[in-house]
Amino acid sequence: MRKYLIILVLLLFLSSSFGYYFDYIKVSESNPIKTITFKINKAENYSYKLSFVHYGNINKSMKVNIYLNGNLAYTIDDSNDASPAYKKNASIDITNYLKDGENVLKVEGMNLIGNENYHPYYVLKDIYINEPAKTPIDFKLMIYALLIICFLIYKKC
């Protein structure tokens, strides 16, 4: 029984543990550009998504551009920005911008100019690039295996 339970837990974590996590990027008036370099083994015929939570206090004349390998992947401006109290999630298809090997993610704040009482900033948080599961079996087969293990555990109890 314990053996089946351990296998079940391992299979549950297997499909959710692939990707690149960058945690937190903040651009501001004093630091308008942030660059992160990372390596990825790109798989053919697979869609890669860049997901993140974003918020900040930019106004109408300001925007934040997200570049991947020099290509503009996403722009945050007055039409889609979010305040610290109301954070937004975004998910971008970056398959065409991603290279096999070394990649550069750049976040650039444009016109982040404040004054004594106003200091503009923008934050990208929980930045994640998903990656395909590197298992010798298909995802459907993993689901079937989970169902069979659950059935075996149910029969034992």
From Swiss-Prot:
Superkingdom of origin: Archaea
Keywords tagged on the record: Signal
Signal peptide: 1-19
Name of the featured protein: Uncharacterized protein MJ1070
